[in-house]
Design a protein with these regions (language model features):
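Alpha-helical scaffolding within the catalytic cores
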Residues: 75-85, 182-192, 213, 217
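Primarily recognizes the serine-hydrolase "nucleophile elbow" in alpha/beta-hydrolase
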Residues: 139-194
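C-terminal catalytic histidine-bearing segment of alpha/beta-hydrolase fold enzymes
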Residues: 181, 189, 198-257
Length: 257
């Protein structure tokens, strides 16, 4: 009985800690000229030196965090950056936009056959209105804050990883590094990529939502053209590879190196 209460108490304290860390992110809503809007959360370095510029991380969430509450997008990944130790060691700006409930970052709708049959991601397709808003929000942020344009990074999980690779392909001169966790892309895009972005892919080997072959093939395609790319595969991990990815010893170190 005592052990049960202790566990409940520990969970309670952990929840308070997570909530406090998420509160470090300010809330905002980006509105374009046509009055289209997108909620986002924004983290700034705890201490900023005058005249110094800092990195920025654009983080794109997965399908499970869609909505308009401006909270859910922090569920997976938010505390990676707001954790006090990491915030001290890696001072940076972090941007977490939120995709609408019924929408997808890079697709007008989810592929009818999911991601297991062929490659449902077209090579040539117009940018979605949601990713366009993300790019506009990013550009506005870069113009407003002391951000080093040579240290703009992008990360994403699942649906957000698909969007990460989409954004890098569309804007090859914007991102210094890209992290894709259990994502997918059209392989021809990777073969044709001309930018200098460095890539790191994470994927679980038994992913039953987005097959691991997408990341394996993307890695091989980039590697074959001489790009700087790394690939980490988690044995026995399903479509939640962000958990071991975030706990990889050099997850942030690689990005900020």
């Amino acid at each position: 009985m005592k052990n049960r209460y202790l566990i409940i108490f520990i969970i309670f304290l952990y929840s308070i800690s997570i909530s406090a860390q998420n509160e470090a992110y300010t809330k905002g809503v980006y509105v374009d000229k046509q009055k289209n809007s997108m909620p986002y959360r924004f983290l700034q370095p705890k201490k900023m030196e005058k005249g110094k510029k800092y990195p920025l991380v654009l983080f794109l969430h997965g399908a499970g965090e869609r909505g308009n509450d401006n909270e859910s997008q922090l569920r997976n990944g938010g505390t990676v950056f707001s954790n006090p130790a990491n915030r001290e060691k890696y001072p940076c700006f972090v941007l977490f936009p939120q995709c609408p409930e019924e929408a997808y970052w890079s697709l007008e709708k989810r592929p009818d056959q999911g991601y297991k049959s062929g490659n449902p991601l077209p090579k040539d397709t117009p940018i979605t209105s949601h990713l366009r808003l993300v790019k506009e929000l990013l550009d506005e942020t870069l113009a407003t804050y002391p951000i080093d344009p040579k240290r703009v990074y992008i990360m994403g999980i699942s649906m957000g990883a698909i969007a990460t690779l989409d954004m890098v392909y569309r804007f090859p001169d914007t991102f210094a590094k890209a992290v894709s966790i259990c994502g997918a892309t059209n392989i021809e895009r990777m073969r044709e990529f001309k930018g200098k972005t460095q890539f790191r892919f994470y994927h679980g080997d038994i992913d039953d939502v987005i097959p691991v072959t997408y990341s394996r093939e993307a890695y091989e395609a980039l590697k074959s053209t001489g790009k700087k790319v790394e690939y980490i595969e988690f044995y026995g991990a399903n479509h939640n590879a962000w958990h071991p990815a975030f706990n990889t010893k050099d997850f942030l170190e690689w990005s900020f190196r």
